[in-house]
């Protein structure tokens, strides 16, 4: 596992756009279409660098991704991408030229080598009648969970997720949303277009230039090294375009719930949390599970 570090670019200006409630409907794979046009880059930006424990010594990084056989893992990834396509089509239509959220998720599908036939099937509008749902939960050790789902039956999905939580040491719990901020996330490879390696120091410089608030080293499901550039929701596509112009290779561009307050768990609770999140991810209607475990 690669070493993990993070650097935050603290903005001196108050952000123009912030998601505060569960009722705000934003698809997870693109920026809101109602961003404040008056938002601009902060006139002054201070860089704060903070080192954290390396992923190789972080217990949660070791146990959170419980993988089955490679073919099953690949199928699970495609299943989640299919749900994301359906949600993007439901909220913005099937034409990626007019639906930036859909364009973003299709870009991610291509990077994962998702079969064209699978993508075309997910794009069919008659299949996109589900309801977008966001559940708040509490996991082992007082951890907070946000569970995104797309379901044709809201009541059934609610009961099923409640059952999975209760069976695996969790529970439905209001208030989990307050531990997360909705942010734009641009994921890029660790090599630029000229196949030159990009280190964290260089990524920080590019983050400042692109107007990002934070950059983190990360890994995808296949343990490939990546950088995640985190920015205000209203500037997601602007930051992506700038990073692309600076020579980086964006893999995806999406909206995510980023925890601003994390909890540390003892090893038995970490194992229990990993099994809970795996059980939730295995449920067919779940798109993504976010946690605030450190």
UniProtKB/Swiss-Prot annotation:
Please name one Pfam family that this protein belongs to: TACO1_YebC_N
Per UniProt, which keywords does this protein have? Acetylation, Activator, Coiled coil, Mitochondrion, Translation regulation
Lineage: superkingdom = Eukaryota
Q: Which InterPro entries match?
A: Integrase-like_N, TACO1_YebC-like_2nd/3rd_dom, TACO1_YebC_N, Transcrip_reg_TACO1-like, Transcrip_reg_TACO1-like_dom3, YebC-like
Which residues get modified to N6-acetyllysine? 162
What are the GO BP annotations of this UniProt entry?
A: mitochondrial cytochrome c oxidase assembly; motor learning; regulation of mitochondrial translation
Q: Which residues form a coiled coil?
A: 190-224
Q: Where in the cell is it found?
A: Mitochondrion
Keyword DNA-binding belongs to the record: no
Question: Mind naming one GO cellular-component term on file for this protein?
Answer: mitochondrion
Quote the function comment for this protein.
Acts as a translational activator of mitochondrially-encoded cytochrome c oxidase 1.
| Name of the protein described by the UniProt record | Translational activator of cytochrome c oxidase 1
Organism equals: Mus musculus (Mouse)
What does UniProt list as this organism's lineage? Eukaryota, Metazoa, Chordata, Craniata, Vertebrata
């Amino acid at each position: 596992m690669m070493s993990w570090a993070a650097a935050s670019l603290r903005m001196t200006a108050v952000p123009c756009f912030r998601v505060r409630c569960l009722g705000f409907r934003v698809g997870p794979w693109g920026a809101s279409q109602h961003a404040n046009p008056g938002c601009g880059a902060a006139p002054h930006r201070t860089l704060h660098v903070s080192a954290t424990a390396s992923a190789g010594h972080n217990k949660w990084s070791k146990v959170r991704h419980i993988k089955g056989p490679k073919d099953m893992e690949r199928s699970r990834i495609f299943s989640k991408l299919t749900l994301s396509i359906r949600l993007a089509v439901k909220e913005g239509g099937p034409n990626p030229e007019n639906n930036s959220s859909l364009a973003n998720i299709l870009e991610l599908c291509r990077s994962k080598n998702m079969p064209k036939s699978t993508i075309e099937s997910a794009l069919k509008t008659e299949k996109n009648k589900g309801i977008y749902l966001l559940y708040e939960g509490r996991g082992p050790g007082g951890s907070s969970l946000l569970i995104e789902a797309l379901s044709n039956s809201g009541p059934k999905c609610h009961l099923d997720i409640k059952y999975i939580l209760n069976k695996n040491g969790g529970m439905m719990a209001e208030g989990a949303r307050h531990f997360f901020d909705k942010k734009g996330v641009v994921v890029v490879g660790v090599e630029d277009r000229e196949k030159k390696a990009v280190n964290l120091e260089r990524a920080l410089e590019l983050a400042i230039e692109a107007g990002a608030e934070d950059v983190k080293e990360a890994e995808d499901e296949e343990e490939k090294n990546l950088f995640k550039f985190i920015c205000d929701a209203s500037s997601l596509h602007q930051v992506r375009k700038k990073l692309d112009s600076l020579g980086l290779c964006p893999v995806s561009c999406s909206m995510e719930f980023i925890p601003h307050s994390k909890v540390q768990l003892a090893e038995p609770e970490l194992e229990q949390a990993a099994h809970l999140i795996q059980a939730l991810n295995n449920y067919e209607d779940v798109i993504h599970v976010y946690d605030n475990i450190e």
